[in-house]
A protein has these predicted regions:
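Conserved phosphate- and dinucleotide-binding cores of soluble alpha/beta proteins
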Residues: 1-138
């Protein structure tokens, strides 16, 4: 979670000792991490069926340096279920409001100037499944 392009938080190809080093890494071929393979198996090009064997095990991707030098950027967080809920809500909020870090690569977009549009499915408040936590506390 928190990847952009195929810059995954636990990818061996994008390991760096510091944020400064991370931001200098360019494009490369990556080996997909298991969570990304599972997520991508849910999309149309892979049959939207959860068939992880239909997902290519490697990807050609831009690097953090390319993200930072891009003139314009589009990062979409609009995948919603039929009821309007979204499995992307937590990671989207980490990217928008959490620390800028290598552990959430897409958070580096916040280092750039630009506009961010967030779908209603992502923006709506979290509800709590636990009685002791009020929605206002989340």
């Amino acid at each position: 979670p928190g990847h952009t392009a195929f810059i995954d938080p636990c990818s061996e190809e994008f390991k760096a000792a510091s944020m400064e080093e991370f931001l200098q890494l360019g494009s490369r071929i990556t080996t997909e991490v298991p969570l990304t393979v599972c997520e991508n198996s849910l999309f149309g090009p892979m049959g939207a069926s959860g068939d992880v064997w239909a997902v290519p095990p490697k990807s050609a991707t831009i690097g953090p340096r390319d993200v930072m030098h891009a003139k314009e950027v589009v990062e979409l967080h609009n995948f919603a279920n039929a009821d309007g809920s979204s499995w992307q809500r937590m990671v989207s909020r980490l990217e928008l409001y959490g620390p800028i870090s290598m552990e959430c690569p897409a958070s580096i977009y916040r280092l750039k100037k630009g506009v961010c549009y967030v779908s209603e499915a992502i923006a709506k408040p979290f509800g709590s499944w636990y009685n002791g936590i009020a929605d206002k506390d989340i």
